[in-house]
Amino acid sequence: MIGRHGVDWWRAARRAGLRAARIAVAAATPTAAARFGVDPDVWQRELVRGSVVSPDRLARTAAPLVRRLLRARQVRIRHPNGTDLTVELLRAPPVVEDGRVDRADRRAGRLWTQIPTGVVAVPLVPGVAQGIWESNRPTYNRFADPPVTLGARFTFRRGRLYEYSFDRGGASFAREYARGGRGRESPGALTFGLNPAISRAPEVAEVAAGTVGLLLGGNRSLGGRNPSRFAYLTTLAEANVELDGLPFLEDGRAVPGARPGDRRRAKVPNE
């Protein structure tokens, strides 16, 4: 896998101006499917469908989200499962993964993409996150034991992870977190999925349209300030998201640009 090459390899790749793509379907093997407990044919078909969504379509979907995120400061994420988390966006351009590695990506040191893709990522201000985040999608990591975690529940106080629990598979997170080092406890970024053909495929959860992801740990590659090498991403589908009190996503679907007078129409779970 490209992502597991060493520092020297990446240094040489940058000097050479290399661009690369990780083709996810190549890793959707029967062995991996058995480890994850999924049907390999279903997994592969979903990845293929997601891979043929064009970069232009993903870029068009991303554009209105990026425009609103650029103007926003505070984000509140809610869901009937108990999620109620408030974070603050760093003053940095959102990163759009649309399947192309362009000049801006290379200037920022991002040399590769994944196929399928489709995600907008925004770094967060440290020391601000407050509330509860509960994932409702599995997190897959073929190199972990166990390789699947479910029901990640994180409680944040004053920008730091205060406590955590999992419905299943939490031992693998606990081991990674214990050796994560400084910065591991800080939420690093939010992600917003764009790809309409991805729903439940392992290892690409963050690109599924209608999902919000929370990255715990380092965010330097996204323009953030946290240099931690620890990174753990969990995802939440069908969330309600507000930007500065205005509706941004309702049940995971984008809300057209709202005006200040629309503030009261922001959907509250269980209304």
Spans of features found by a protein language model:
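Short, glycine-/Ser/Thr-/acidic-enriched flexible segments
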Residues: T29, G82, A92, P138-Y140, ...
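Active-site bordering "gate/hinge" segments
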Residues: M1-Q130, A258-E271
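Long, well-ordered mid-to-C-terminal structural blocks that present hydrophobic/aromatic surfaces
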Residues: V125-R175
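Short helix/loop capping segments that flank catalytic or ligand/cofactor-binding pockets
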Residues: A32-R35, L85-E88, V95-D98, R142-A144, ...
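A short, polar/proline- and glycine-enriched secondary-structure boundary/capping micro-motif
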Residues: D98, S172-Y177, R253-V255, P260-D262
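Internal helix-turn-beta structural module
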Residues: R200-N270
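Short polybasic amphipathic segments
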Residues: Q74-I77, A152, Y162-Y164, E238-P247
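Dual-mode signal for accessory low-complexity, basic/Gly-rich regions
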Residues: P147-V148, E163-N226, V241
